[in-house]
Swiss-Prot record:
InterPro entries: Cyt_b/b6_C, Cyt_b/b6_C_sf, Cyt_b/b6_N, Cytb/b6-like_sf, Cytochrome_b, Cytochrome_b_C_euk/bac, Cytochrome_b_N_euk/bac, Di-haem_cyt_TM. The cytochrome bc1 complex contains 11 subunits: 3 respiratory subunits (MT-CYB, CYC1 and UQCRFS1), 2 core proteins (UQCRC1 and UQCRC2) and 6 low-molecular weight proteins (UQCRH/QCR6, UQCRB/QCR7, UQCRQ/QCR8, UQCR10/QCR9, UQCR11/QCR10 and a cleavage product of UQCRFS1). This cytochrome bc1 complex then forms a dimer. A ubiquinone binds at residue 201. This is Cytochrome b. It comes from the Eukaryota. The gene is MT-CYB. One of its GO terms (biological process) is mitochondrial electron transport, ubiquinol to cytochrome c.
Amino acid sequence: MTPLRKTNPLMKLINHSLVDLPAPSNISMWWNLGSLLGTCLVLQIVTGLFLAMHYTPDASMAFSSVAHITRDVNYGWVIRYLHANGASMFFICLFLHIGRGLYYGSFLYLETWNIGIILLLATMATAFMGYVLPWGQMSFWGATVITNLLSAVPYIGTDLVQWVWGGYSVDNATLTRFFTFHFILPFIITALVALHLLFLHETGSNNPLGISSQPDKITFHPYYTTKDILGLFLLLLTLMSLVLFSPDLLGDPDNYIQANPLSTPPHIKPEWYFLFAYAILRSVPNKLGGVLALLLSILILMTIPMLHTAKQQSMMFRPLSQLTYWLWAANLLTLTWIGGQPVSYPFITIGQVTSVLYFITILILVPTASLIENKMLKWT
């Protein structure tokens, strides 16, 4: 008798995606990140839903409603900190997932890669709007500074900012619309994830060697389901350790002070996962130039497939490319550190040098290293 999972239309769909999916036999733990990102997304939607039941998106009550969730709601503090730190885990997995794609040449699957970049932008937008909702000092001033960047758009900039704000400053209208978009975007992200998987399953997964996976495949279940469960346990262990032992480690103390338009915090900075882009923004003295550099720091990922000059897909056997890759990774960490530092010497200079290096590595060093390797291997 044929199993139900192979005959029922709905079960058949799940079966082809999670059970009988042909997967390369040699994919490493770096391929676990997709399932971890799915777990993070589900966790964020569930915890966010419970938070939305108790949160009040009103400028006069938002801060108090978050305090009420933390103090009075049954396990409200767990839900709140799971949601806040879950976002951090989401971005850690996201950055590692992109890093894996860059290292092993997964960007050559163009549709999957481009939808992935759209997913990154949508996730960043969602996280930014979520950071505004507690209506603390850093929420308010972060929203003011980042939305104000739209004023750099020539001619229509000022009107654009006031349109986003819903007034002449960040106020109740801004908070309400940010809550609305923060609520709806995760569901749009879920739809994009389905598209991402649809295109991935058209080509099949890449593998560490960067060679065809067709000759040697195994079923996703039980081999990779077991492997994914191990990754899941490690993720939950890290997340619960953060939530239960040090829930405010990645947050900002200023956000425990209610938003006050008349008092500016000494150092306005976004959440840690935006610091690299914030550092690039601050490194350019011109406002419009800074905004363009900020956008390009993410959108440059779309040019990676065009800059691929190597004859091999993966970096596994390309030592020069590996060197440039790890230089870029170290540079990214330096930018993250710089983004959290005050705007003073020597941080300004370090920020400018690392920002220039960020673009030079991607646009010049990696393609050049690949061409040299082609010559060395006599593959030209």
